[in-house]
Amino acid sequence: MKFELDTTDGKARRGRLIFDRGVIETPAFMPVGTYGTVKGMTPDEVKATGAQVCLGNTFHLMLRPGTEIIKQHGGLHKFMNWDFPILTDSGGFQVFSLGAMRKITEEGVLFSSPVNGEKIMMTPESSMQVQRDLGSDIVMIFDECTPYPATEKEAKDSMELSLRWAKRSKEGHGDNPSALFGIIQGGMYPELRAQSQAGLEEIGFDGYALGGLSVGEPKNEMINILDHCAYKMPADKPRYLMGVGKPEDLVESVRRGIDMFDCVMPTRNARNGHLFITTGVVKIRNAVHKTDTGPLDPECDCHTCGNYSRAYLHHLDKCNEILGARLNTIHNLRYYQRVMEGLRNAISAGKLDEFVQDFYARRGQDVPELADITN
């Protein structure tokens, strides 16, 4: 992987990640394909929304169908017929989401498979091996996702364990030519985040991610961590904010220097009739849309908006038709990509402030202030 930084506008950055399989223009949003599929979408449909990369979930793919069958296909790209880059998460977040079904030790995490109850030990080494078997282009280290809320001691202990696992992940990654990203932890404590980042930089990674956000904390706490941490992340490496989020969160994070995002929100919300448009949100199952012959978003160039009315989408939702979820997903993913395209173009033109003002004005919202934190 090669990372090129073209230009900046304030703290916002415009660049690209270059792989043998393709280029990812940044800032980038990555749709989530948990089980090797973006729910309800073919790979060509995902590409048509403007996506240049997608996510696979190490934890879920390890359990079903298992890495052996994926290896027999020649890796995840061929298994799912996706020839653009793939990022795989380490499985850490999913393991820690199991709660009482798992036990954390220095070695790793022992958990009961939610599929068949089998006891499985997941370690930094095994996570690296699974991701090597999947053949992903970007591999994430195995870390502990610090829960929220957490005391400073709990966050410190968790962060230090993640650092020890980061070193083992780097060693386990070995001669794998794929890019390896470190994950900054430390809960809602900027000092712990700084210690985590320093430790990760000492080990050395191809990119750096902020983990442990969007885990239930109030938005102001997430923004505070971004204010204190994003601009300090290595300038010559891609910066990835994991699991975030709403369109407004993407804009605010880009303003603070983040390059990469992933979130299930556009796809999950689409299946629940919650659709993102230029002026905010449309809840398509509400009765007001029953007789609306207009498009979902007149400014959107997606297949859904170009061919179907709000009334039709409302009808499909009410009848629980699979096509409704598919058309909604096409639109939401395209909307997210349009936001990212707008951000990229604005940064390139030195007009990010104008883009941000227009983005919020169309929603009837004020532009949030940027904190002046530079040390």
Curated annotation (Swiss-Prot):
Q: Which GO terms describe its cellular component?
A: cytosol
Gene Ontology molecular function: any one: metal ion binding
The protein's required cofactor(s) are namely: Zn(2+)
Residues that coordinate or bind substrate? 89-93, 143, 185, 212
Q: Which InterPro entries match?
A: ArchSynthase1/Queuine_TRR (IPR050076), TGT (IPR004803), TGT-like_sf (IPR036511), tRNA_ribo_trans-like (IPR002616)
Alphabetically, which GO biological process terms does the record hold? queuosine biosynthetic process; tRNA wobble guanine modification; tRNA-guanine transglycosylation
Pathway named in the protein's UniProt entry? tRNA modification; tRNA-queuosine biosynthesis
Keyword list, A-Z: Glycosyltransferase, Metal-binding, Queuosine biosynthesis, Transferase, tRNA processing, Zinc
- Stretches the record annotates as RNA binding: 243-249, 267-271
UniProt keyword annotation of Transmembrane present: no
Catalytic site residues? Answer: 89 (proton acceptor), 262 (nucleophile)
Q: Does the keyword Transferase apply?
A: yes
The protein's Enzyme Commission number: 2.4.2.29
Indicate which residues the UniProt annotation says bind Zn(2+): 300, 302, 305, 331
What does the entry comment about cofactor binding?
Answer: Binds 1 zinc ion per subunit.
| HAMAP family per UniProt | Q_tRNA_Tgt (MF_00168)
Could you say which protein family the record assigns here? Belongs to the queuine tRNA-ribosyltransferase family.
Record's function text: Catalyzes the base-exchange of a guanine (G) residue with the queuine precursor 7-aminomethyl-7-deazaguanine (PreQ1) at position 34 (anticodon wobble position) in tRNAs with GU(N) anticodons (tRNA-Asp, -Asn, -His and -Tyr). Catalysis occurs through a double-displacement mechanism. The nucleophile active site attacks the C1' of nucleotide 34 to detach the guanine base from the RNA, forming a covalent enzyme-RNA intermediate. The proton acceptor active site deprotonates the incoming PreQ1, allowing a nucleophilic attack on the C1' of the ribose to form the product.
Under the subunit heading, UniProt states:
Homodimer. Within each dimer, one monomer is responsible for RNA recognition and catalysis, while the other monomer binds to the replacement base PreQ1.
| Protein's UniProt name | Queuine tRNA-ribosyltransferase
